[in-house]
Amino acid sequence: MFAALGSAVPVAAGAATGKPHRGTVLRAKPAQVSIGPRTVTTWTYDGRLPGPRIEATAGGLVRAKLVNGLPADTTVHWHGIRLDARMDGAPGYTQKAVPPGGTFDYVFTVPDPGTYFYHSHVGMQNDRGLYGTLIVADPHEPLGYDEEFTVVLDDWVDGVGGTPDEALRRLNASTAHDDTLRSTLLGGVVGELRHPYHLINGRAAETPEVFVSKPGRLVRFRVINAAADTAFRVALGGHRMAVTHTDGFPCAPVTVDTFLIGMGERYDFLVRLGDGAFPLVAEAEGKRARAFAIVSTSHRAPAPAATCGCAS
């Protein structure tokens, strides 16, 4: 299967160094972020969307200090990681919630390499921007590739259609269901809300993220669905993708035109890039909306439109 991608080369980005994680401070606090043409006030880690990228090596320790600058209790959950339950971030079950002004030290071993993420586990806080990536390198990485990019998908309402909590209250008070939110997959129902924006790495389609590479490079994409209510169908225009990992773990490689990623899931794929500018599109399954980014290997190529063949 990999013959179609060309010969493997030594991995450059994301390679394990064997060095321990130096520690991260996650400052949960209100901040202003740009969502398309709007500037909204939301909750973030360190004023960033997504929050800081944490990198570790399988078998090593992660050290992260949560500093709660929010007007509400909070925690951090490490999504997909096998760890000591005391570090899992489930308030009322594995730890006490961290109050406003409080701190908590998360210290745990990451046993498995792969693509993971972290997020608040209190109420609707994950929907307000409290999430970030956790990439665990394999010290014996079997794949050879030139570089890697991380793609974080999200659906967004905070500061545009009220807060996520307000949107949930409106939904619970209504007896109607939007029957247009349908799919032939996922049991037919693909969500409860229409979100004003769908994001890639915190950016809306009006001001898309641009991944810059070179023609012929073999690139690993790590795709994380951090959305609360949206499954996405992902495609890279003009390319087929070799899916190599699901939820952090290696799988039998499958070459596809598109793949469907549910909430909380992660997929890794390899692709050898062509020459030009290509749309990376994540169709919101059953919602007639999309997240959009650009993969560019040529400064001469025009920016693509936010469409590609992601038929649902």
Regions found by a protein language model. Name each.
Residues 5, 12-29, 39, 130-170, ...:
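Extended terminal and domain-junction accessory segments
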Residues 20-143, 229-259, 279-290:
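Histidine- and aromatic-enriched segments that form or immediately flank copper-ligand environments
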Residues 42, 46-53, 105, 195, ...:
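Non-catalytic, beta-strand-enriched accessory regions in extracellular/secretory proteins
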Residues 61, 213-218, 260-265:
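Conserved "landmark" site that anchors the functional core of diverse proteins
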Residues 225-227, 236, 273-275:
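A generic beta-sheet turn/junction motif
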